[in-house]
Amino acid sequence: GGYLPRNYINFDQSVAACKKKGAGWHLNQTGVFAYLNLLSQKMSTVPHGNTNYGKDYYHPYERGTMPQGETQRTLTGSGQPTWYHNHDMSGIADINGNLWEWTGGLRLMNGEIQIIPYGNSMKLDCDMSASSTLWKAIKPDGTLVEPGTAGTLKIDRTSASDATLRINTSVTTQTTDSNDTSEVFKNVKAVSGVAIPKLLVALGLFPDSGVTGYGNDRFWARNNGERLPIRGSAFYNTSNSGPSALYLNNPRSYLNDLIGFRSAFVE
């Protein structure tokens, strides 16, 4: 801890930076990020964080450490114990706020939800490129199938005039590069008749019916083109912030001052 998190880095650069550290190191997997969030919900320790330019939006007396001249990011792990996933300094810090984080193993392709399953995105030789054959789509019963298979789960916009995000097995309204679809995460629903497998909950793409601690964390997406996830909100998200916040709007080449990444290690 105690470092200023890196920003201005795109998805592929984040993957490469993690792999450069050697065997076992990888871009934090989207399912692990979602697991930490679900764990904190079950333990009633939903983490606070830097969601309002150095302080927690809902608990403004809680502040992280900012180096001189910095107005956005706080040093990693420099917040209160409540800024850790278990509300204790032994936990994982900053999964809520500070910077949005690229995560591995999940993407949208023209709205179709695709994953690299079985933790394979943690492997040093995993190909997460746009053309990788490792990507799989998901049927409503949780079966993994080849991308483009009929009836797979997709992110859909309700209509041209209604930007509400929903889960569907087809895309009825496609977004453009200048608009999107969104919903407060806890309110995300499937179209009538579309079943939601537990896998979607485990991926942090659908709320767990047993959880009551979800805040106003928001889920944004674009269902045109390839979109890679950033998770956990950032220093400016204020009332839309939270560990369930998810932004599936950006292409893999995108970078700015709001987005960073987290490397993780597995043996």
Feature annotation, model-predicted:
Residues I115:
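Active-site loop architecture of trypsin-fold serine endopeptidases
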Residues P5-A16, A23-G24, N28, M109, ...:
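Disulfide-stabilized, aromatic/cysteine-rich ligand-recognition loop
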Residues W100-E101:
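Generic structural signal for well-ordered beta-strand positions
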Residues G1-I95, D125:
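Short aromatic-cysteine micro-motif
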